[in-house]
Each structure stands twice: as structure tokens, then as C-alpha cells.
Amino acid sequence: MALPKIEEVRQLSDEELAEEIIATKRELFDLRFQQATRQLENTHEFKHTRHRMAQLLTIERERQLNINQSSSTSAEEA
């Protein structure tokens, strides 16, 4: 599995982004569980999944800040 591109994440809608975050959190949980029970064969999947989670959370935070910046800018203009 190749590391995902940030451009792919930016194209997601807000709802898709939220769903993807939940799915990735679940995947991390499953990977941790597999590791604890010594069933995990591909340990590099942790890196890929954590990288994906970081991308998703970064895009989510950028969108929150853009919303706040645009609303505060319009409030300052008034």
C-alpha cells in the first residue's frame, strides 16, 4: 500500500472527511489489537495509517481555521 497523497484528501467533502477519520481511527484500533495478540504481520501498516490520520486531521483543522478566519474577517469589516 502506497502512502496516500494529500491532494486526494483535500478533494473530500466534509462528510467524507469525517467518515474517513472514523474509519482510520478504527483501523488503528484494529492494528493495535492485532499487534497485542501477535497477529500483525505487516508492522509498516502502522506508519501508513498514522500518516493517513495526520493528513485527515490536518485538513480538518485547516478547514476549521478557514471558516473561523473568514467569519472573523467579515465581522471585522462590519
From Swiss-Prot:
A Pfam family hit: Ribosomal_L29
GO annotation terms (biological process): translation
GO molecular function, one term: structural constituent of ribosome
Presence of the UniProt keyword Ribonucleoprotein in the record: yes
Keyword Ribosomal protein: yes
Keyword set, alphabetical order: Ribonucleoprotein, Ribosomal protein
Family: Belongs to the universal ribosomal protein uL29 family.
Protein name: Large ribosomal subunit protein uL29
Lineage: Bacteria, Bacillati, Cyanobacteriota, Cyanophyceae, Oscillatoriophycideae
